[in-house]
Design a protein with these regions (language model features):
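Short, glycine-rich nucleotide/cofactor-binding loops
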Residues: 4-20, 48-53
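Histidine-anchored nucleotide/phosphate-binding helix
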Residues: 18-32, 38
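Short internal beta-strands
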Residues: 26, 36-41, 76-80
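Short amphipathic alpha-helical segments and helix-helix/interface helices
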Residues: 26, 63-67, 106-107
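Anion (oxyanion) recognition and catalysis
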Residues: 30, 70, 110-111
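Short, active-site-adjacent cap segments at secondary-structure transitions
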Residues: 45-48, 85-86
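A glycine-rich helix N-cap at a beta->alpha junction
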Residues: 54-82
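C-terminal structural segments of small proteins and small subunits
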Residues: 86-112, 117
């Protein structure tokens, strides 16, 4: 089993499919039996907030998919220092207080993983 780390940095629903494809890849890797970790930082932290709503013109609920991945064993951490200053919903709580991370955690994850991908 390989260890994969996906680092997401972009605002969800920003007109690109960065977050969408990252979450799809995480799910595909997990389904193959790989060990998957996701770290959200910068504006991507909004993916971990219940206040982030799927736009009407978007066919995929990114927050729901992230919750599903996490519930199915994908390790998840969200930048702690980004909480108050990043995203459209800066300062609003993450959907799970246990997912709050740090740069030290990210550094450990990078060092431990076989492959790191950024989106």
């Amino acid at each position: 089993m390989k260890k994969f780390l996906l680092i997401l940095t972009n605002q969800p629903y920003n007109g690109t499919d960065n977050a969408y494809n990252a979450l799809r890849l995480a799910g595909a890797l997990k389904n193959r039996g790989e060990y998957v970790r996701i770290f959200l930082m910068n504006d991507a932290v909004d993916l971990a907030r219940n206040s982030t709503q799927k736009p009407e013109n978007y066919d995929f609920d990114l927050v729901a998919k992230l919750k599903e991945l996490h519930a199915n064993g994908v390790a998840l951490k969200v930048c702690g220092s980004c909480d108050a200053r990043c995203g459209l919903h800066a300062g609003e709580p993450y959907f799970d207080s246990e997912i709050k991370g740090s740069m030290d955690i990210l550094a450990s994850w990078v060092a431990e993983c076989d492959q790191v991908m950024t989106f």
